[in-house]
Amino acid sequence: MLIQIAISNSPLHDTYTYKIDAPVEPGERVEVNFAGRNTIGYVVSLEEKRGPFKIKSVNKKVDDRSFLSQVDLELAKFVMREYLAPPGKVFDLFFPPGKLLSIDDYVVAFSDELGFPPTQKDKFIKEFGEDYLKKLLASRKVKIMHSFDRKTPKKRKTRRVSLAKKTGIIEQELTPLWQIVVDYLLSVESEEITELEKKLKLRSRSPIDTLISKGILLVEEIEEDDSHWVIPAVDELSVSQKEVYREIMESDSKSFLLHGLTGTGKTEVYFKVMEYWLNRGRQILYLVPEVSLTPQLLARIRGAFPGRDVRQYHSYMTRVQRQMIWLDSVEGNVDILVGTRSSLWVPMKNTGLIIVDEEHDSSFYQQSVPFYDGVQAAIRKAELGNIPVILGSATPRVDHYHLTESGRISLLSLTERPVGSFPTIRVIDMKDEKNPIISKQALEEIKRTVSEGKQVFVFVHRKGYSNYVVCYTCGKTITCPHCSVSMTFHRNDNLLKCHYCGHRSAIPKVCPECGSMTLSARGFGTERVEHDLQKFFPSTKIMRMDRETIDNPIAYEKALLEISRKNCQVIVGTKMITKGLDFPDVEMVLIVDADRLMSFPS
């Protein structure tokens, strides 16, 4: 048999002809020799005709079955055709990175008469011979079953420290650094070591390690559980939400655009539709544009669907984690899969509904080969599978809004908030303010909000302490030697950092241009705003959320947990605090230096 093969990880736009003796299906993975090396290939199609040329044979089959359905194959062809994407790169999307979990073949008897338990195929052949196995298979007394060698991903572990005893500490002789650590731990039960280093701004872990070795501190290793955070579900839909749900369930259309302003309850409508399909044994694919949106969403889904298997899938996970979730999704063990655009390609066994939240977001566009639009691919996948797809946004894409007028997509609208009213927006003129960063009125509102037990979000569009360092004498701005852009001053690290390439350098003592000592840090970022607010409100707990303090999804989820538990009153952050977060005690949002945002591209 001749087959057309797409070469894995190849930028080439062609498929290649190989021959194989074993039965094979489109979508299966095989090993082939291509350009002098053995590599993975994907069976794209089967052929009967043989050309007048020598054809290579396939080395071996990799999986013994195709993981891809007809819908997956048609979706791959759509992406190849629509975005001129290389076939091998497109098929790579459907599989997790790295070598897929190994598959063991087992010989399983149909009855107990043969008197042996399920046995690995290789061991069976070694003990009884291959001819005997063929005889049993031909007489249908045994069958071959596949079992995946599942690696158990390591659970995250954190190390927390606490005082061995809180009495008698004062009498001990402590160095200044040790005293800082002890004073802090006198006010709390325990603290994670990495967090303790950050909060106390320690240059190294040495003071903590020394206190542990002296027996003053106790250390405890705790295994973390990803599923602790649960947000209780909303009991009942509002009248307008029920109307939208009814339209979805009664419509002949399969594609919907749910246009609803922030806070109108689009998520509750999603959950109601999800409930319908889950009760019918179907799987749900829930797409979000960024990893940062998954922690709180997962907590809400767990609260709405207790007992359901809810997983997340994104590029920040380890290879083993992604492979395990991929495999469980393929086998139909996952009820709800939440993830970024990469989760669109997981070949789920029984998908019944696709939800694309924040469908307008540019993060759904793949910016590297193979290029594609994740939202358009999701719509096409739903059409191929004849299942509903719901696109949700407060600011829908223009082209999708146009499709609602032509009838290809049904438009649904939510205009009323189920709880509360839309916020009052005040614009404060900073011309006459003494403080160039935060107005007197804003400070008074923060004080009032915090005193009432509520929380405040402060959005700053740049991280760091100061945007640039300039020489007053000659006007020279300190720039990155690699990028020629101004370097940002970070006060906590006492360094200049380039936010483009990551280059770091110490602050020069004199101007590199004229030799003057009149260097000054100008502008501000999250670090400066946090510093100023802490001066105004010394007893208020302030958290900063930017790429300096939150550098991975685990840290982000921990920060959200701190906010939900009200362990901080004021949260200062960059755009990571502006997307999809919903905390009932946040009563005030402050946008610092809003003028600068007006000239930014959207």
Language-model region placement:
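Inter-lobe coupling/hinge segments of SF2-like helicase ATPases
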Residues: 233-242, 254-602
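Accessory, non-ATPase domains that flank or precede helicase/AAA+ motor cores in DNA-metabolism machines
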Residues: 1-393, 405-419
